[in-house]
């Protein structure tokens, strides 16, 4: 494979020296970009965009052609695994993701297969290898998956949920059934991420979008335990380089110490944490990624720059910080504001790496 021309993202995750703080954005290939909207219209719908490696590659590279980002992230969806388990993923306009089949009994869970990354999710592996080839060493490629808990909520609720009542009822009424489901999902996520690494992903992130909705005890039992299991089963070195692992639990700021013990190289932070405080708590163990409130991008470029400066100052000197938003960039953001954000990170962070 081609040597990396810009490896500061990987270096920061491994707490090695960098010249400036690296930056990328969750959902950087997304609806805020007119070129993404054009590609999506051409593909027909969101799933066709995900399932066609050429389209997935095209939209992954769009933000990199526009901005000096330090990483690319595979364009896909966290729900590819449940779809490959036979649940029938589809998208309702205005409703988000739905499943044709819902998991409600132990028998449903027993019947679920563990997908084979090559056979059942080959389109994702093809997308990874295509993107990696097209990147030609420009920046590293991030692979990703949803966490077992987050995937389980969609599978049991049948789609998005405000209160996760069915999944939480299962956690308390029938924990053995939920553990069986989470165990199958942990196996599936491990092989899925390892497949992505072998196909060319140079770092991986686990998105635990709904872990922060659990109580502290339930988070340990139903979310963190399974992420720890995945991390211990991942390929950590490939092509002569370490493959860093990032864990991101949205609203998980109260539990950073426990998450930092899970074996990952870095923790993602949402915007409710103060990054300087997070560094004092766990910065000796892990790198940190984040954590500007995505809605700051609706403000004027000068205000965006000011908030970037504040977060950089809060983190302080030295490596171990990858700048990102605290969650995905939203569709209505002006692309110029995203550009102002990225430029501000590079321009204002150099002083912290001298």
UniProtKB/Swiss-Prot annotation:
Q: Where is this site: Transition state stabilizer?
A: 77
Indicate the quaternary assembly: Homodimer.
A Gene Ontology annotation in the biological process aspect, one of them, is: protoporphyrinogen IX biosynthetic process from glutamate
What is the protein name given in its UniProt record?
Uroporphyrinogen decarboxylase
Q: Which domain of life is it from?
A: Bacteria
Write the record's keywords in alphabetical order, separated by commas.
Answer: Cytoplasm, Decarboxylase, Lyase, Porphyrin biosynthesis
Give the residue spans that cross the bilayer. none
Q: Where in the cell is it found?
A: Cytoplasm
Annotated residues that bind substrate are located at 27-31, 46, 77, 154, 209, 327
Q: Name one Pfam family in it.
A: URO-D
Q: Which organism is it from?
A: Pseudomonas putida (strain ATCC 47054 / DSM 6125 / CFBP 8728 / NCIMB 11950 / KT2440)
> What's its EC?
4.1.1.37
Pathway it belongs to? Porphyrin-containing compound metabolism; protoporphyrin-IX biosynthesis; coproporphyrinogen-III from 5-aminolevulinate: step 4/4
List all disulphide bridges recorded for this chain. none
